Structures are given as C-alpha cells and as structure tokens.
Amino acid sequence: GLLIPGGWAPDYLRRFDSVLTFVQYMNDHKKLIGIICHAGCVLSSANILKGRTLTSTPGIKHDLMHAGANWVNTAALIDGNIVSGRRPPDLPAYMPLVLEVLKTQESSE
C-alpha cells in the first residue's frame, strides 16, 4: 500500500510526474492508498478522484470537489482502495481503517 503524509509535503509531491504515475498505478491495481490532511491534493493531481468519496482537511475541500470527489466532513472513511483521514487528531479513527483495507488486500492475494 501507499500512505501519503499530510502537511506541506503533498504540495511538493504532486509536482512530480513519477509520483502521479505511481499513484495512478496503485489506484489502477486497487492497492491501498492512504491519505490524511492535505494528501488528497496528490490524488487530485493524479486525476483519480472522480466519483470517489473522501475526507481531508477542510482547507482543500474545494480542490477535491473540483476534481470530482464527494467530500465528507468526517474523521476517516474508506472508499474502495482509498482510505482518507481528515487531520492528525483523527489518526485513532484513520489507522484502523488503513489496517482493515490492508488485511482485506492481503487475504485476497
């Protein structure tokens, strides 16, 4: 799986085609993509959010919606292979979902 950190790192990561290609590969192969806080902007730049439901820090809500995502103000949620968390204080809700998806993927391989 792939976990993308929050903070300012995603704004830097989204500038690299190799990062976006890897995110698209992980999504195409239905592998776990975990995002929290500002990390959703990487998925937005990778153009994989149309029709997906996720959460993030409210500061990028409109960016994600303009990329086609359904944004929900909740601590954490799963949409297929994408696990999203709102902010670092929501890690207690986010991490069990990440582990749930990893277990599901491990048992199906």
Task: Identify the residue ranges that each predicted region occupies.
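Active-site-adjacent pocket-lining segments in enzyme domains
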Residues: G1-E109
